[in-house]
């Protein structure tokens, strides 16, 4: 939807009706200059794919996705990958019970220091792929 919108520095999507959306993959991919993004009003109850949703949002420093209903999501690969200036993500409330792919979910988030709700990201028996999930997260202590 906003894939490769390199010139956006802020984006207000609080009024978007996302109640029937099943695929949010690549939604904000490559929004390299995006610094402010408010997705707190997103209804994600039907979403199954969040892969690369915020990938390469290189100037995003903080993201609050606490309101995301992730109970139906199966793919979270690269979700926050290559967000090199991302310092804080709040995933409190995440339900990863159906997720089968979390590969490179936080790959290359070299400035990530705070991952609130990380206890909700569980490696359950059904997760087939967690390869390089936190690769390059040099400052993160979980």
Language-model features, listed with the residues they occupy:
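Negatively charged
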Residues: 1-142
């Amino acid at each position: 939807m906003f894939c490769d919108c390199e010139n956006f520095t802020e984006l207000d999507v609080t009024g978007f009706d996302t109640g029937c959306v099943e695929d949010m993959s690549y939604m904000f991919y490559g929004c390299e200059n995006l610094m402010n993004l408010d997705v707190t009003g997103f209804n994600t109850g039907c979403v199954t794919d969040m892969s690369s949703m915020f990938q390469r949002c290189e100037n995003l420093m903080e993201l609050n996705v606490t309101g995301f209903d992730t109970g139906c999501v199966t793919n979270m690969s690269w979700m926050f990958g290559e967000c090199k200036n991302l310092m804080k993500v709040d995933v409190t409330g995440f339900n990863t019970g159906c997720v089968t792919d979390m590969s490179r979910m936080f790959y290359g988030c070299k400035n990530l220091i705070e991952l609130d709700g990380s206890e909700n990201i569980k490696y359950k028996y059904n997760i087939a792929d967690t390869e390089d999930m936190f690769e390059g997260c040099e400052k993160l202590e979980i």
